C-alpha cells in the first residue's frame, strides 16, 4: 500500500505479459450456476437467483442485438453437473451467437486479448485480471450479486462512476453502442 491507494493485486497474472491480438468485437463471459442451493457467496445460489442472472443476460443481449454491428461471442463455464440451463435459454432467444465452452482450469484472460471489449457478469478474479492486464473490460452484474470488501469500496465506486461497472443491462448496452 502506498499512501491511500490499494492496488488490485492478482497473483494469477504475476509476470504475465499479454500481447493484444484483436480480431473480434465482444466477448461476454458468464457462468452456468448450479440450480441447487450451495455455498454462501455473492453469486446465484439456487434456481430463483439463477433466473435473475439469466434474465439479466438475455436483457443485455436483446439490447446489444438491436441494430448492432458488433459480433458477440459468449464464453461460459458449466457447473459440476454439466448444467446448461442459462445457455439453452440464450440459444432459444438468439440464433446467431457464437459460443465457447470452457472449464475453470483455463485462465479467462487467455481468450480475452483477441477482443475489443470483454464483458464480465460477476465480480470475480477474471474481472480483476483483465483490469490488471489493462485489457478492455466492463462488469455488468445485478446488485444482489455484487459484494466488495470494505477496504476496496472506494476503488469500486470509482469504477462505477467511470462506467466500468454497470448494474443495469440496458444502460450498459447503451454505453457499449457509443
What are these regions (language model features)?
Residues 10, 58, 70-133, 142-144:
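Donor nucleotide-activated moiety binding/catalytic core segment of transferases
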Residues 24, 46-48, 65, 95-96, ...:
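Alpha-helix initiation/capping motif
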Residues 16-20, 63-66, 109-110, 129-131, ...:
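A general structural signal for short secondary-structure junctions and capping/turn motifs
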Residues 34-37, 63, 101-104, 148-153:
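Short amphipathic alpha-helical segments, especially helix-boundary/capping motifs
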Residues 2-10, 21-23, 94, 116, ...:
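Catalytic binding pocket for nucleotide-activated donors in carbohydrate/polymer assembly enzymes
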Amino acid at each position: 500500500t502506498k499512501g491511500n491507494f490499494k492496488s488490485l493485486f492478482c497473483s494469477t497474472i504475476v509476470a504475465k505479459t499479454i500481447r493484444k491480438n484483436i480480431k473480434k468485437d465482444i466477448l461476454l463471459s458468464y457462468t452456468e450456476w448450479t440450480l441447487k442451493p450451495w455455498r454462501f457467496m455473492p453469486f446465484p445460489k439456487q434456481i430463483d437467483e439463477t433466473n435473475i442472472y439469466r434474465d439479466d443476460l438475455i436483457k443485455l443481449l436483446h439490447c446489444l442485438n438491436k441494430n448492432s454491428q458488433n459480433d458477440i461471442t459468449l464464453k461460459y463455464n458449466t457447473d459440476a453437473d454439466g448444467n446448461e440451463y442459462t445457455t439453452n435459454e440464450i440459444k432459444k432467444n438468439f440464433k446467431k451467437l457464437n459460443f465457447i465452452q470452457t472449464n475453470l482450469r483455463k485462465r479467462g484472460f487467455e481468450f480475452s486479448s483477441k477482443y475489443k471489449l470483454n464483458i464480465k457478469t460477476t465480480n470475480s478474479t477474471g474481472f480483476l485480471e483483465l483490469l490488471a492486464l489493462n485489457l478492455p473490460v466492463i462488469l455488468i452484474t445485478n446488485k444482489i450479486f455484487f459484494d466488495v470488501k470494505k477496504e476496496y469500496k472506494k476503488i469500486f465506486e470509482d469504477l462505477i462512476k467511470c462506467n466500468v461497472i454497470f448494474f443495469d443491462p440496458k444502460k450498459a448496452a447503451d454505453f457499449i453502442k457509443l
